[in-house]
Swiss-Prot record:
It holds the Pfam family Ribosomal_S13. Keywords: Ribonucleoprotein, Ribosomal protein, RNA-binding, rRNA-binding, tRNA-binding. Belongs to the universal ribosomal protein uS13 family. It comes from Finegoldia magna (strain ATCC 29328 / DSM 20472 / WAL 2508). Located at the top of the head of the 30S subunit, it contacts several helices of the 16S rRNA. In the 70S ribosome it contacts the 23S rRNA (bridge B1a) and protein L5 of the 50S subunit (bridge B1b), connecting the 2 subunits; these bridges are implicated in subunit movement. Contacts the tRNAs in the A and P-sites. One of its GO terms (cellular component) is cytosol. One of its GO terms (molecular function) is rRNA binding. PANTHER family: 30S RIBOSOMAL PROTEIN S13/40S RIBOSOMAL PROTEIN S18, SMALL RIBOSOMAL SUBUNIT PROTEIN US13M. The keyword Ribosomal protein applies. This is Small ribosomal subunit protein uS13. The gene is rpsM. Part of the 30S ribosomal subunit. Forms a loose heterodimer with protein S19. Forms two bridges to the 50S subunit in the 70S ribosome. Residues 88-116 are annotated as: Disordered. One of its GO terms (biological process) is translation. Coiled coil: none annotated.
Length: 116
């Protein structure tokens, strides 16, 4: 099993899909990386050579992934809460942030119904 950025990539999947197991790398980023390195996206992870894996590791160093990205997102939300903007207050209250109505729905953000 190939280990990149502290994540074990699934051996039986195509490289294009396997790279999406890394937080912050989606299909588009994965395809862009593979095209730049000249690696066939249909290759299975288990068939990658050690040199190809090291090339992928070096290319991923240019991307914000895993812990760094999670920390960055958390710091952005924390900053919104600290400056007491509307979005920050919605984060604090656990309500939808992007303008959705909450009269009937938003159960995911609001949690289970509270009995009166």
């Amino acid at each position: 099993m190939a280990r990149i950025q502290g994540v074990d990539l699934p051996n039986d999947k195509r490289v294009e899909i396997g790279l999406t197991a890394i937080y912050g790398i989606g299909r588009q980023s994965s395809n862009k990386i593979l095209a730049k390195l000249g690696i066939n996206p249909d290759t299975r992870v288990k068939d990658l050579t050690e040199s190809e894996l090291s090339d992928i590791r070096n290319e991923l160093d240019n991307y914000l992934t895993e812990g760094d990205l999670r920390r960055d997102v958390a710091m952005n939300i924390k900053r919104l809460k600290e400056i007491n903007c509307y979005r920050g207050s919605r984060h604090k209250k656990g309500l939808p942030v992007r303008g959705q109505h909450t009269k009937n729905n938003a159960r995911t953000r609001k949690g289970p119904r509270k009995q009166a």
